[in-house]
Design a protein with these regions (language model features):
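N-terminal secretory signal peptides that target proteins for export/translocation
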Residues: 1-16
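Bacterial N-terminal signal peptides
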Residues: 22-31
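Acidic, polar-rich low-complexity tracts and alpha-helical solenoid repeat scaffolds
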Residues: 31, 35-815, 819-827, 833, ...
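A short, structured beta-strand-centered segment in the mid-to-C-terminal lobe
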Residues: 852-862
Length: 939
């Protein structure tokens, strides 16, 4: 039993129990220090999120609340998979009237139709197009200086767009009817071109593309054989998209059960794959089709191709995160952009299954053995082990125990390790085997047996590399048995007696974590009556400072100072906090420099050293103006009460940032500025610079225009296959991204195509290539593409309807989806504002939205309205505070209220103590996006 102690206090809000938050923050920081790869989560307490790289969030909108407006403890809501919420919402905001879908004026009728198509208002678009069919001249205006296009050309253009609209709204029969009329009109089109729009040249392109639309419509009505003929007719004119279309043909055959034909098409598609990942994806589909037909011999050959292709995957760029220039970026699977890693171990397992089904047991066993060696800590390795054991194939007993332990098959793991020790008592791995037994016993809840197994390691294997792990396991076991104080003593004893062990710093880290967690279990009412020598927080601080003193070069040292600093600040111990942050800056200058500077300033300010604090913030704002902490520092430099009202204060602060001298926001100014950039390195594929005589410098270079991926991607987007088109455009982007002469016109073309994520990425990277490297140091024209206002009519009207700041809504959309309408998260959230389907259904009910279905969440006109309504709802629920509203949008409104209550009105501390690393980064990034939107659009 441990004695109770006086609970933690905070001068910010009376009795403030910090334990739950700091324990999770410690754990997150510990996990970070153990995982130094590019996808590692940042240090939890004082993240230094570099901004403003375009980042797609992995978050999902929380379930629409319906419980009490004041929860007493955090709910089980998670940022990616919310499960609960408050039970009694405040009065819902009055449902706003639906926004009128009107494009920015002036616009021709055809431009209006294109706008309606872009926001998903297909019904309105079709009504407008049908009206134009009755009077085609209205589509181009009745009074023109140039000769009018022929009525046949105008009707053809309208019918083509009508077919696209019907396909987008899943009305293939109507699309087919429009295409039949389009084909009939083709017989009457003039041979010569015209200066009016659409030109005969455009109609000729429409005619070629109409074969693809016809194929799509035929497939939609079940006429698969005719559809395939139409697809192949299209490929005769557009061979650059053969790989994509062959897969579409395969899907067409599969829809009617023609698996053999589908397999042939998938083979063709794989032959056209441009990357190893794409080839593997297609071959995996092919293998599945062959397995379904029982053609196991062919399936084995395909798996061998997959395994061979996987070897080249490491040489390819990561198309998901490498564009961000920051290692802590984590992309969501935005449709059309996600590139999945190749998990070789799973293909080795599946190849083994195929070989076994084909009757080649030796080859099957060989593949399963390779799976065990490839990645023991994987499901595929465990499944491979099961296959080997079922066939009585010999397997190293130690490896068998490890794999069983990874798979939580604890009893088989114990059996394997015990047999290993019995058969090989002198093996160098015997100590590790005993530790494996102990871990399995802990998994089974067999505490006494686990303690005896750990003692075997500590007593009999002093030279085992696993000794440090055994010490940690012994301490963790003591905590699991209900004696956390004893566990902390074990951690400290280990760190003191074996300071050279690599795990010694981690032992002190875990001891500090345990001390903080201990406070969560105290009886607050009884705590004052118990004589406690040391408060848990003081105990934790002692561990953290000992860690930094004894192990200054350890991975945990900087994080320990950060945790100690934030904890001290939250407790009102500002001098102690200042000392910790000053040490962090001086001893670990590269660890968290911006966070340390900001919080040192906050600590000094709280001590009354206002001038010192402002000097720190001014220096930080000047050196890192576009990082989260740099933005906060700029805000705080003139604030009487720092840490508060970030959103209301942001506009005036950001608008004061000057633009480049003479910058009028024009494209011409931007292009003059671009001419000052240095020439690209000579070793780049700068075929983009081969513009022919007569071209302007910033036209799309011929090498790019003729690039098969660019041409094919543009074509697929124009014919309604957005996801496939974006995949190809992504390849072209990566090919020319480091060549400004190519990247700038590519950016413009991406923007015109509505490839929003790519245009944002191109603009951002173009700015990074410039000498300034800062968004605010680039021309406003480029800044507006890097931070766009896509769907402005909808965003502005819906924000006004629910009385929220439209720039905050733009910032949220930027973070959630990078303005990609079909974006989807792992949690199932969809669309521009990432609405979870269940939340969408409840919003639809509250708004009396007719004919709601999950598919409509991908339509901008629906999603923006729902997102704006929900953000306002959460804001009303979360004390009408914008920062708390954003937390509630990501992690659940119940959680947001509880967390904000404990730090209010300090928004900076609120964000710093968020227990979900994802939510903290989400807030930091949105606030930085908001800074840029306010700076660019409130001048």
């Amino acid at each position: 039993m441990i004695s109770a102690s006086i609970p933690f206090r905070s001068r910010l809000s009376g009795r403030f129990r910090l334990a739950n938050f700091l324990s999770l923050l410690l754990l997150l920081a510990l996990l970070l220090t153990a995982c130094r790869d590019r996808r590692a989560t940042p240090v939890a307490v004082a993240t230094d999120a570099a901004q403003p790289a375009p980042v797609a969030a992995t978050s999902a909108v929380a379930t629409l609340p319906a419980p009490t407006a004041r929860a007493s403890a955090p709910t089980s809501e998670q940022p990616s998979s919310p499960t609960s919420s408050p039970t009694s919402p405040p009065a819902s905001p009055t449902p706003p009237p639906p926004a009128t879908a009107v494009p920015p004026a002036p616009a021709s009728p055809l431009e209006q139709a294109a706008y309606l198509h872009s926001i998903g208002e297909y019904g309105q678009e079709q009504r407008l197009l049908n009206t134009l069919l009755a009077d085609p001249q209205t589509s181009f205006g009745r009074q023109q200086e140039t000769p009018a296009a022929s009525l046949e050309q105008q009707r053809s253009a309208i019918l083509y767009r009508l077919a696209l609209s019907h396909l987008a709204s899943e009305q293939p029969a109507r699309a087919l009817n429009a295409l039949d009329q389009f084909r009939l009109l083709g017989e009457f089109l003039p041979v010569d071109d015209s200066s009016a729009s659409p030109s005969a040249h455009e109609i000729a392109l429409f005619t070629i593309n109409s074969d693809f639309l016809r194929a799509e419509a035929l497939a939609g009505v079940g006429r698969s054989a005719e559809a395939v003929i139409a697809y192949r007719t299209f490929l005769e004119e557009r061979p650059q998209v053969a790989g994509i279309v062959e897969e579409i043909i395969a899907d067409t055959w599969l829809a009617v059960g023609e698996r053999s034909q589908a397999a042939n098409a998938l083979r063709e598609a794989a032959n056209y794959a441009a990357t190893a990942r794409e080839k593997v994806r297609l071959l995996e589909r092919l293998a599945g089709v062959l397995e379904g037909m029982g053609r196991w011999d062919e399936a084995t050959a395909v798996y061998d191709q997959i395994i061979a292709a996987a070897g080249s995957e490491q040489e390819e760029p990561d198309l998901v995160a490498a564009d961000l220039d920051q290692p802590d970026s984590d992309y969501d699977d935005i449709l059309g952009y996600r590139e999945w890693p190749i998990f070789l171990v799973s293909y080795l397992y599946r190849a083994g299954i195929a070989y076994a089904a084909a009757g080649d047991e030796d080859a099957a066993i060989a593949h399963w053995r390779k799976a065990l060696a490839e990645e023991p800590a994987s499901d595929a390795a465990y499944l491979s082990l099961v296959q080997l054991v079922n066939r009585n194939a010999p397997v190293d007993l130690f490896l068998r125990g490890e794999i069983d332990l990874f798979a939580k098959a604890y009893i088989p793991a114990i059996s394997a390790f015990e047999r290993f020790i019995a058969e090989s008592p002198d093996d160098a791995r015997a100590g590790e085997a005993w530790l494996g037994i102990a871990r399995a016993q802990i998994g089974l809840g067999q505490w006494t047996a686990a303690r005896l197994s750990i003692d075997q390691v500590l007593d009999n294997y002093p030279d085992c590399a696993c000794l440090g792990s055994a010490w940690l396991a012994r301490a963790q076991l003591a905590t699991a048995e209900g004696a956390p104080a004893a566990g902390r003593r074990i951690y400290r004893t280990f760190a003191r007696e074996r300071p050279d062990d690599p795990l010694a710093p981690q032992a002190l880290w875990l001891s500090a974590l345990s001390a903080i967690e201990a406070d969560a279990h105290l009886d607050v009412s009884a705590a004052h009556h118990v004589d406690v020598p040391v408060e848990p927080f003081d105990e934790a601080v002692a561990d953290l400072l000992r860690l930094t003193d004894a192990f200054p070069d350890s991975q945990q040292a900087a994080a320990a100072l950060s945790v100690a600093g934030i904890g001290a600040f939250a407790h009102g111990r500002y001098a102690q906090a200042a000392n910790n942050f000053a040490r962090l800056r001086s001893h670990h200058p590269n660890a968290q420099p911006h966070a340390a500077a900001y919080w040192l300033g906050r600590s000094r300010h709280a001590q009354g050293e206002v001038d010192t604090a402002r000097a720190l913030w001014q220096e930080l704002a000047a050196s890192a103006p576009e990082t989260y902490y740099g933005v906060l520092a700029g805000l705080e430099a003139g604030a009487a009460l720092p840490g508060r009202d970030f959103v209301p204060r942001m506009g005036a602060f950001a608008a004061a940032v000057p633009a480049l001298p003479g910058d009028d926001g024009s494209r011409a100014f931007a292009e003059d500025w671009l001419r000052t950039l240095e020439d690209p390195p000579q070793d780049l594929p700068a075929a983009a610079l081969d513009a022919v005589e007569g071209d302007t410098q910033w036209d799309l270079p011929h090498a790019v225009a003729d690039d098969p991926d660019f041409a094919g991607g543009e074509l697929l987007i124009q014919t309604g296959r957005r996801a496939e088109g974006l995949r190809l455009l992504e390849q072209a982007y990566w090919r020319y991204r480091d060549d400004p002469a190519a990247l700038y016109p590519l950016m413009l073309r991406f923007d015109a195509l509505g490839a929003n994520r790519l245009s944002i990425s191109a603009a951002y990277h173009l700015i990074k290539l410039s000498p300034t490297g800062k968004v605010a140091g680039a021309p406003i024209f480029l800044q507006r593409i890097a931070y766009p206002r896509h769907y402005a009519s909808l965003v502005e009207s819906e924000a006004a309807a629910v009385e929220i700041d439209p720039l905050l809504l733009y910032s949220l959309i930027f973070q959630e989806s990078l303005f990609e309408p079909p974006a989807r998260s792992f949690a199932g959230a969809q669309g521009l504002t990432q609405i979870i389907p269940s939340t969408g259904a409840e919003i639809a009910q509250r708004l009396n939205y007719p004919n709601y279905s999950v598919d409509r969440l991908s339509l901008p006109s629906v999603n923006i309205r729902f997102g704006a309504y929900y953000l306002r709802w959460v804001r009303d629920f979360a004390h009408s505070n914008d920062v708390a509203a954003l937390v509630g949008y990501n992690a659940g409104p119940g959680n947001a209220n509880v967390w904000f209550d404990r730090t209010a009105p300090d928004e900076a501390l609120f964000i710093e103590l968020l227990p979900y690393d994802e939510t903290r980064l989400y807030l930091q990034r949105i606030l930085t996006h908001y800074y840029h939107y306010a700076r660019i659009y409130t001048r």
